[in-house]
């Protein structure tokens, strides 16, 4: 029997979550099998995932019809479908949640992407989601926008688990980590237990390389007269995301060594783990599991789409590489400022955050439109 390399990753202190959720895999028993036998210890979802799951699948039709008969508006029908799937996934993962002492076993659901820049609306929806879904191992996904951080702080203070998503820059990760700390401190000051709260910071990868590679390709296409300059440009391709992630992990280590964090640990706090997201390789010329292999290391999570899960199970070369070549990672990021390369990483990160929110709003709106069309077909005349 061939080795499932996903199971090896756990030995290095990294958890593998799946970036996918559909009713099919819940009802068929596939999700249960992946959790029990294949090393999957959490689930992340987003509007794009639910758009694919619901829009073209008859498995949801009976529930849609029930919503129509009950006179529910489209958005409430959408929530009834998604909340049911999230609850069932939480129940399947509950044994992992308990066996891992609440380290793993979480299912993430994102607040509506349309409120990514509205602090109060984000807090309000997080409360409602947590209450209505009613599962202790639920994680609320909140985008790491500037208005999102006060929401993270408040939601943590109220005792909810939080997945801060769409983090691209090291600075945005650090800001997120301290928002988690402030939320715990606030809760502690109110005399409440902080030992049952979990958080992950979702740090995105492949989108960074896709953006920067396109900029480099554009420079190369224009023509570069100097061979040395051409070599500099090519040396950066496909390397920035992993280097950036390694630097984020170094910041994580500084934070957990801080006196402020250690005081929270003494009161029972659980560390906020870095979660590697957007880990499917977009360029077919690259190793299809490079965003997994290069970032295996302790106290981290990698959320992986189904195709990449299969690829990694089959041929991942697993070792603890998260802290290898860290000096080279610093050098590579610094080299982006070289006049011959001239890529402003801060601008790239800002672009990606705007794009990231848009990439969730578009499928969310598309799903609302698809549901509206389905309702017309399924509604009694």
UniProtKB/Swiss-Prot annotation:
Signal peptide: none
Pfam family, one: TAL_FSA
Keywords in alphabetical order: Cytoplasm, Pentose shunt, Schiff base, Transferase
InterPro entries on file: Aldolase_TIM (IPR013785), TAL/FSA (IPR001585), Transaldolase_2 (IPR004732), Transaldolase_AS (IPR018225)
Reaction it catalyzes: D-sedoheptulose 7-phosphate + D-glyceraldehyde 3-phosphate = D-erythrose 4-phosphate + beta-D-fructose 6-phosphate
Subcellular compartments: Cytoplasm
PROSITE patterns: TRANSALDOLASE_1 (PS01054), TRANSALDOLASE_2 (PS00958)
SUPFAM superfamilies xref list: Aldolase
An example Gene Ontology CC term for this record: cytoplasm
Active site per UniProt: 141
Pathway where it operates: Carbohydrate degradation; pentose phosphate pathway; D-glyceraldehyde 3-phosphate and beta-D-fructose 6-phosphate from D-ribose 5-phosphate and D-xylulose 5-phosphate (non-oxidative stage): step 2/3
Primary residence: cytoplasm
Gene Ontology MF terms in the entry: transaldolase activity
E.C. designation(s): 2.2.1.2
Biological processes per GO annotation: carbohydrate metabolic process; pentose-phosphate shunt
Uppermost EC category: transferase
CDD domains in the record: Transaldolase_like (cd00955)
Family: Belongs to the transaldolase family. Type 2 subfamily.
Protein task: Transaldolase is important for the balance of metabolites in the pentose-phosphate pathway.
Name of the protein this chain belongs to: Transaldolase 2
Species, as recorded: Nostoc punctiforme (strain ATCC 29133 / PCC 73102)
Lineage: Bacteria, Bacillati, Cyanobacteriota, Cyanophyceae, Nostocales
